[in-house]
Amino acid sequence: MSRLHATILTVFPEMFPGTLGHSLAGQALQKNIWSYDVINIRDFGLTKHKNVDDEAYGGGDGLIMRPDVLGNAIDHALSLNPRAKIYYPSPRGKVFTQGFAKEILRDIQLNSESFRQDEFKEEPAEHIIIREQRRMPQNSLVSSLLNDAVNMIFLCGRYEGIDERVIEEYNITEISVGDYILSGGEIPTLTILDCLIRLLPGVLMNQNTLASESFEKDGEFEGGLECGLYTRPEVWYNRKVPSVLLSGNHKLINEWKKEQSLMITKLRRPELLKDLRDKERS
């Protein structure tokens, strides 16, 4: 059984696995470290044309994905993965970060044991899922986003977006990948999954690599940006590798890397330093 399973609802099923079928994610897919299935929303469309959208109440440009169509597609997905939490890539959502990704995977791991214990409770598991999935308060903390899910469902919106009632009825968590607009939710879904997959045990050859990457608050750069990287040749277009990296003095090298990380972070992402100071004060 894979460690992470994603069910993807989309009107463009041919977009998956896409880039996730290559490189590290592709190898992990072949090893069954993660798995996925795709549900074509148009299979639940209306009329012979399989329509999935309609005009917006209240006017405005663009078409809205219908709640009846999406509801049927979601119900089908939940029948296959009843413990899944539903995610909707949206510019209104909480911004997806490295820390957010780690929280999601940690919650999956911590709650996998409780899933098995649920099987021994007298209350039918299906009843439990409906109550927790659809009636959980909308203001739940990020740390509880995946409290009930080993499986994930991604709802990929198109056109102007989806009917708000779908989000309310299924208690869908909206996730943003940044302050910009894309044509649909497929690319954000690929981005989110790629980040999650590479954090799974067995995907990276050396799991310690994660500690030396940008945004890792417990890592080498303490949540800042990674320093510049260098490899052979030693001189390229009259540009030399910094001499400290050739010295063999690991103490000096580590100090240089941290100084460079601090300088780059202060210049390009100063808010990350504020987050670090806030963490130290708490």
Curated annotation (Swiss-Prot):
Which chemical reaction does it catalyze?
guanosine(37) in tRNA + S-adenosyl-L-methionine = N(1)-methylguanosine(37) in tRNA + S-adenosyl-L-homocysteine + H(+)
Q: Which organism is it from?
A: Rickettsia bellii (strain RML369-C)
User: Biological process GO terms, please?
Assistant: tRNA N1-guanine methylation
Q: To which protein family does this belong?
A: Belongs to the RNA methyltransferase TrmD family.
Originating gene: trmD
Q: What is its EC number?
A: 2.1.1.228
**Complex formation:** Homodimer.
For this entry, the protein name equals tRNA (guanine-N(1)-)-methyltransferase
Q: Where is the signal peptide?
A: none
